[in-house]
Amino acid sequence: MAKTIKHPRWGRYVAEAVGRGHPDKICDQIADSILDECIKQSPTSHVACEVFASKNLIMVGGEILTTGYVDVVQTGWKVLNRLGYTENDFSFLSCINSQSSEINQAVQSNDEIGAGDQGITVGYACSETEQLMPLGSIVAQALVQRAARIIDQYPFIKHDMKSQVVLNYTGNKVQCESVLMSVQHTQDVSLDQLRQTIINQVILPVLTEYGLNDPKIKHLVNPGGSFVVGGPMADTGLTGRKIIVDTYGPYANHGGGSFSGKDPTKVDRTGAYFARFIAKHIVSLGWAEECEVSISWVFSQPLPQSIQVKCFNINKEFSEQLINQVISQYFNWSVAKIIAKLKLLDQVEYFRYAVYGHFGHQTAPWEQLSERDSLQCLIKNFQ
């Protein structure tokens, strides 16, 4: 069954997602939990936390400058306990250093906040879904989210899992060609039972919800066979290795910087959140069906080096040049103002966004459409 979308695409798009128990995501969750604790105790904390997980070892490193005290090991275990691990499963090694005084002075001086590093950040939105996110990314994330929700009902399912969705676009029509899921499981369940459970309880309900279900779709569940050993016991995990899963899949560009374990002075995170905030406003207002915002930054500088707004399938009333003018004039682009606008130091629990993508969650501050009315008035004045 083909689903109709507002704006045309052509060709195959493949999107993937991973679950909470994936080794890279375990690391992201620990890093963001440490960040949350630092900000909770001292909002001016500067955090650059990295986590490495392999076999029975969890290693936490990085640079942290804070007036608070965070028990890194205890914070890490809160994440691991939620995934069913016990204290016998891992040993922790902590190698946290203080942030360089040179970096600290460059980032925060004279009541200004400078960019914590150079870099390029990208935000994207499109009209394919109500979340203004690409359909493939939303479906891939929905699959692993649903599988996680039924673990209590089907305890042979474990938290390390991946999904992959192939969508074929022909203009304003899109069809799902295949769904792949690899799901860790206990030893006492047969592959046939696991496959039938995942197909009937996860894949079919999600495809039906998004209007994509079709008997021709190929369902691939654990195509490699049994998947009993998972998590860091099977594969090494590291923070920041799922940047495409965290954002927009194959649908948009990426600046290259990861998010987890970084405080809001790190523009890899803050710039990407703000770029999404802007792109979502543009699409929600009907100025374009698809929008990509790119912002480049210079280390220690409070304002961006460049801002570029690219729009596709633009409303005939407007032009890309006009949209760029309105956006550039309306928003305050300083790092400090972005942090304040998105409430990144007082209303965000970063751990919540370490899995299932950082975008499309309606409760996130960067997903709110607070500036719609003001932008609509401003663009009329420009015309």
Curated annotation (Swiss-Prot):
K(+) binds at residue 50. It comes from the Bacteria. Keywords: ATP-binding, Cytoplasm, Magnesium, Metal-binding, Nucleotide-binding, One-carbon metabolism, Potassium, Transferase. The keyword Transferase applies. Gene3D superfamilies: 3.30.300.10. GO terms for cellular component: cytoplasm. L-methionine binds at residues 63, 99, 235, 266. Mg(2+) binds at residue 24. One of its GO terms (biological process) is S-adenosylmethionine biosynthetic process. It catalyses: L-methionine + ATP + H2O = S-adenosyl-L-methionine + phosphate + diphosphate. Its EC number is 2.5.1.6. Its cofactor is Mg(2+); K(+). It is found in: Cytoplasm. GO terms for molecular function: ATP binding; magnesium ion binding; methionine adenosyltransferase activity. Belongs to the AdoMet synthase family. PANTHER family: S-ADENOSYLMETHIONINE SYNTHETASE. This is S-adenosylmethionine synthase. It comes from Mycoplasma pneumoniae (strain ATCC 29342 / M129 / Subtype 1). The lineage of its organism: Bacteria, Bacillati, Mycoplasmatota, Mycoplasmoidales, Mycoplasmoidaceae.
